[in-house]
Amino acid sequence: MIIFQKKDVIPIIIPQICFNDKYDNINNYVEMNPSLFIDEKGNVRILVRCVNYKKLPDKHFTLYESKSNSIYYNITGIIHDSDKLDIETFDYTILDYEYNLPIFPSYWRGLEDIRFIDANNILVIIPELNEGGNPSILKAEINNNRITHFCHCKPNIVEKNWMPYFNNTNNYKVIYSLHPFIIKSIENDDLQEIELSETTKNKLVGYHGSTNGITINKYERLFLIHINRNITHHRWLLFNIKTNTITLSEEFVFFKNSYIEFTCSLVNYNNRIFVSIGVNDNKAFIIETCYTDIIELFPKCNNEENLPTIITMLYDIRSMENNTTERNRKLESYIDFSCKFLLKLPFPLIIFIDDNEETYDAIYNARKDANLLDNTYIYVCDFKSTYFYKHLSRLHELQQSFHILNGEIEHETPLYVILNNNKFDCIDRTIQLNPFNSSHFIWMDFGINHVAQSTDYIYEWIHKVPDKIKQLCINPYTETNSPKTHFQCIYHNMAGGLFSGSIENMKKYSELFKNKTEEIYNDNWYQIDEAVMTMVHRENPHLFELYYGDYRGIVSNYLYPVHNIDLIFKSSQKYLDYNKTKETHSLLCYCAKYFEMNPHCDFVFYYIQQNIITNYYNNNRLLLPNVINLINSKINSDIEHDKERIHILLENNRTNIEYYENKALILLPAAKM
């Protein structure tokens, strides 16, 4: 059995409530089933239920008065940001309540198992407010140390564990039951059954509700549910209120030796998740955990081919800026472009979007129409909560003092810079979540096919993503002046629209990018993401495996050149001009397949020439076999012009060729090399 990983366990020890029991002994109430709420400012309220009975492992219990009685302690205090939840400094008082409804005879007295709806509204079980004296759900208001204004919720039958959640339409609902899976509004009898798969239905048999639901993003709510066997087992339940789908975690327990575990509350405070839990009906705790540890218990999507996950995002920053200039493409055009390529790819895809229902629907429907929902994860994330958004005011300041000479300040706005930098925040979040259990990841701009051509080449390389960061180099950064001086202009050295790598290398790239960004901001300048990537590459070349071309070939050129061979040879010549033979050799090896398929291309002579220069230093004094084959094919060509050109090339490089140990493989009928 899985024991859930916990960041912290906070015991709740309350002042004892003593009484003379029915055996004429001094006895005391025992604490159990706490409820918890923390507001945005860190104000904490813990309600601890105390009872006059003790439950045993064999399900029997001992009652110490004639009837079961339940009393609540109200514990209040405050938590600051990342500080430990220290309830020893909190205030403890007995909770007061005032019924405004008739009281009926019941074996159970008092309030039971409170669940917070929000800071001032609760759901509570009160048998003595039910005509039959049975457990019954009521809604009530809580203010300070007092609960009032009780009202019945319908249908008022024994479904004890309703789970409230915010429905995103300015109202609250509850999960009323799990099997069948039914939701409803809080007070009205408007049950709505949601159809689930048979597999999911079977997993929910015997399960009951536990906690309220916390908001993970606009459409996803996280709950805890439980089942009582010989001991209590739990599952996390993730409910998508947009698609009416649920995902269940593996079963687990919180503690190794407990036999009863009852959770009433979940709280998400500053991305710290707290669970209130009663153990064995005689102990109360608060557990702190995090979403990363929770999501680890969810089964990963079936990815038998170990396909990489493609990561992308779509945020309408121009609407945030109220910017309607023609220079900036509208969101609709990005979606139109993506429907022709990215959104129809049959590979694992995670898309980060803002809290925008139209965007969500457009993406969801496009993937649904393509029957690709199983390979789709839509991650709703407020742009203001992303990692690089914290730099907004700093970028406004930097743009006043540091000017990119060929930049367009109306286009490269602070939000634009933040948006592109946030590729790495999306990468970090995806690796943390890893919904498709991938070992490798690909960043791909959402509207990449606006510039990319021959994009179907992705089907050739999607299974061949290397561990190293594979990224397009357009213009090698060989210049020797300081980065701050050099990057007063945008040079598009590296293309930021597509790059890939293993988990570890993508995490490392993200860390290096974040550090470099902080470094240049602290040096009072900034640049767009591609320039920062270029600097990271220059300082960490071992981390990268470059491919070459221009934006036109950003998808197609991944394995070998398809487009831009002319530009690629400008890059190789630039390397040579700076005496970077290793980089030139690597580029030429990347081009080998191109010339295998295009031996009559005019650039083949540049290819041969540069290999003659670089192979000696980078291939153990041996000309590459494919280079020798190309030389010999030109020597024996039926095209006189090719014969003349290769003869001139070899004559001009006679001295260099003499140093190669395999020069004898060159077929020269007219001269010995």
Descriptions of predicted regions:
Residues 371-433:
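Active-site-proximal specificity loops/subdomain of glycosyltransferases
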Residues 1-303:
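Beta-propeller domains
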Residues 448-454, 464-467, 471-472, 476-477, ...:
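Catalytic core and acceptor-binding pocket of nucleotide-sugar-dependent glycosyltransferases
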Residues 564-574, 589, 601-614, 625-629, ...:
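Amphipathic alpha-helical repeat scaffolds of TPR domains
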Residues 585-591, 621-638, 642-647, 673:
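Alpha-helical repeat scaffolds
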Residues 415, 419-472:
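GT-A fold catalytic core of metal-dependent nucleotide-sugar glycosyltransferases
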Residues 359-374, 392-394, 627:
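Short, aromatic/basic amphipathic alpha-helical patches
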Residues 303-333:
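N-proximal low-complexity "stem/linker" segments adjacent to membrane-targeting elements
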